[in-house]
Design a protein with these regions (language model features):
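Negatively charged, low-complexity tracts enriched in Asp/Glu with abundant Ser/Thr
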Residues: 1-23, 87-88
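Short aromatic-glycine-(Arg/Gly/Cys) micro-motifs in beta-strand/loop hairpins
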Residues: 26-51
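Mixed-charge, Lys/Arg-enriched low-complexity segments
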Residues: 44-94
Length: 94
């Protein structure tokens, strides 16, 4: 997947502080927080992930880690959805 960096024109894209995925549905973004050094964080609006700390400090490794974390979350959601769909519907007052 393509990522857009906010690196200054003429500088390597890895020098940026924000790497936003070119996917509108998931909205994966890897970024640094001002005042937190070289630590990278991820956001994924579709999964409700905001400022999750990543273990990698290089852009490519952090993006790979963020994609892996998004996949893990999607797998958990898929299992939960399958559980809901395979269970009998029950309606109660309380």
């Amino acid at each position: 997947m393509k990522y857009i960096s906010n690196a200054k024109y003429g500088e390597p894209v890895e020098t940026g502080t924000i790497y936003r995925g070119d996917n509108k549905r998931l909205g994966i973004c890897v970024h640094r927080l001002h005042g937190c050094g070289e630590t990278l964080y991820m956001d994924c609006m579709a999964l409700g992930i905001i400022d999750r700390k990543l273990n990698n400090t290089s852009a490519i490794s952090a993006i790979n880690e963020a994609q892996s974390l998004a996949k893990q979350e999607l797998d958990l959601l898929s299992k939960e959805l399958n559980s809901i769909l395979n269970s009998e519907i029950e309606i109660s007052r309380y």
